[in-house]
Regions:
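Conserved glycine-rich cofactor-binding loop
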Residues: 7-9
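A conserved structural motif in NAD(P)-dependent oxidoreductases
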Residues: 194-205
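Short C-terminal tail/terminal secondary-structure segment
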Residues: 132, 210, 221-235
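The beta1-alpha1 cofactor-binding region of Rossmann-like NAD(H)/NADP(H)-dependent oxidoreductases
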Residues: 32-33, 53-65, 203-204
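Catalytic loop of short-chain dehydrogenase/reductase
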Residues: 85-89, 121-160, 172-173
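Short, small/polar-rich loop/turn modules that mediate ligand/substrate recognition or access, typified
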Residues: 160-164, 220-222
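Short, flexible catalytic-loop segment of classical short-chain dehydrogenase/reductase
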Residues: 169-180
Length: 235
């Protein structure tokens, strides 16, 4: 399997949980130190890991990254599109859309071009912000996440080969990126309104992603699964 944006947060949790389930994991990120520490963590646990610093806006880099992964793993059954801009507040609308939604489409297209088999699956990381008000998010963020949800449903409908395509839609998740971006008062307000009374953890989302990839979810297709502690029912 391949996880983009695997260096921290949801991507890192997904890679670890899926590795613990016995999957071979390829991890892409542009943060070399995070990639190195993740690789050490996973290999110490006995996992087979391929790590690469891949710019997911560069189609040639994407192709090279897949080639390097295939040399070790052969067929890549599962794809998790998680990468996005690291400094959300400083991103322009067009760049945010390209970085989040455009890169998801580019990586998925390159993955599909490698050839698919029955049972292959992709999970994209959307957001509840794409379904409900974006709150304090920059305009590009809910727009990009809504596009990712739509792209996921498109893939499920078209089903190139025999893939399944699903997405997760996290609410507020306690990741370094989110904590740095949101003001404390805003985060507290969201948490107070949540039926579960807390923010999500990366493992909450990672576990949902790994489930959607697994044979246990073999008849789940075209779903955008909220992983938000019930935040959507309060709107």
């Amino acid at each position: 399997m391949l996880v983009t944006g695997a260096g921290s947060g949801i991507g890192r949790a997904t890679a670890r949980i899926c590795a613990e389930a016995g999957l071979r994991v390829a991890v892409w990120d542009l943060d070399y130190e995070s990639l190195a520490s993740l690789t050490d963590e996973l290999t110490t646990g006995g996992a087979t890991v391929v790590a690469a610093a891949v710019d997911i806006l560069d189609e040639e880099a994407i192709t090279a990254g897949f080639a390097a992964t295939q040399e070790v793993f052969g067929h890549i059954e599962y794809l998790v599109n998680n990468a996005g801009p690291t400094n959300a507040a400083e991103v322009s609308f067009s760049h945010g859309i390209t970085m989040a939604a455009g890169s998801t489409a580019n990586v998925t297209s390159a993955w599909l071009a490698l050839g698919r088999r029955d049972g292959d699956a992709v999970v994209n990381v959307a957001s509840v912000a794409g379904n409900i008000t974006g709150g304090g998010a920059e305009a590009w963020y809910p727009s990009a996440k809504a596009a990712i949800a739509g792209f996921t449903r498109y893939l499920a409908l078209r089903r190139p080969g025999w893939i399944r395509a699903n997405a997760v839609a996290p609410g507020l998740v306690d990741t370094p990126r989110m904590v740095a971006y949101m003001q404390d008062d805003e985060a507290r307000s969201i948490i107070e309104r949540n039926p579960m009374g807390r923010a999500g953890y990366p493992d909450d989302v990672g576990a949902a992603i790994c489930f959607l990839l697994s044979p246990a979810a073999s008849y789940i297709n075209g779903v955008v699964l909220p992983v938000d502690g019930g935040a959507q029912v309060t709107v």
